[in-house]
C-alpha cells in the first residue's frame, strides 16, 4: 500500500473531524465513517491482491465479494457526489481545500480498487 495514500486518508479524516459545517454534523460524521470504511476495504482488497493465493480463501470466506465490490463502488460514487456538493456550497477556504483533497483521494482510491478487482477477476 502506498504510504502517501495512508497519510492522505489520515490527513483528510483529521481535517474533516475538525470542521464545523453549517449543515448537519451528522452528515459529516457519516462521510467520515464511510471514508474510514472505504480505507479499510481498500487496504484489505490490496492485501488480498498482494497474496494472490488468498483469492480462493476470499471466495470461500465471502462468496459474495463481487456484490460487496459493487456496494463499495456505489459508496464511492455517493461520496464523490457528496464531496462535490460540499465543495460547491462552502465558502471557507480550509473546507474547500479539504474537500478538493478528499475528492482527489476518492478518485485515486476508486481507480486503485478497480485495478485490484480486475486482478482478482
From Swiss-Prot:
Q: What is its main location?
A: virion
Task: Provide one Gene Ontology cellular component.
Answer: virion component
Q: Which Pfam families match?
A: Flu_NS2
Q: Which InterPro entries match?
A: Flu_NS2 (IPR000968)
Protein name (Swiss-Prot/TrEMBL): Nuclear export protein
Which organism is the protein's source? Answer: Influenza A virus (strain A/Chicken/Shantou/4231/2003 H5N1 genotype V)
Q: Which domain of life is it from?
A: Viruses
Which GO BP terms sit in this record?
A: exit of virus from host cell nucleus through nuclear pore
Amino acid at each position: 500500500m502506498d504510504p502517501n495514500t495512508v497519510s492522505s486518508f489520515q490527513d483528510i479524516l483529521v481535517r474533516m473531524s475538525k470542521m464545523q459545517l453549517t449543515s448537519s454534523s451528522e452528515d459529516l460524521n457519516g462521510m467520515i465513517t464511510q471514508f474510514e470504511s472505504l480505507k479499510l476495504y481498500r487496504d484489505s482488497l490490496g492485501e488480498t491482491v498482494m497474496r494472490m493465493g488468498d483469492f480462493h480463501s476470499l471466495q470461500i470466506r465471502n462468496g459474495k465479494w463481487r456484490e460487496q465490490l459493487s456496494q463499495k463502488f456505489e459508496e464511492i460514487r455517493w461520496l464523490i457526489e457528496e464531496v462535490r456538493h460540499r465543495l460547491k456550497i462552502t465558502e471557507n477556504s480550509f473546507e474547500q481545500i479539504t474537500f478538493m483533497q478528499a475528492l482527489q483521494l476518492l478518485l485515486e482510491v476508486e481507480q486503485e480498487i478497480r485495478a485490484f478487482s480486475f486482478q482478482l477477476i
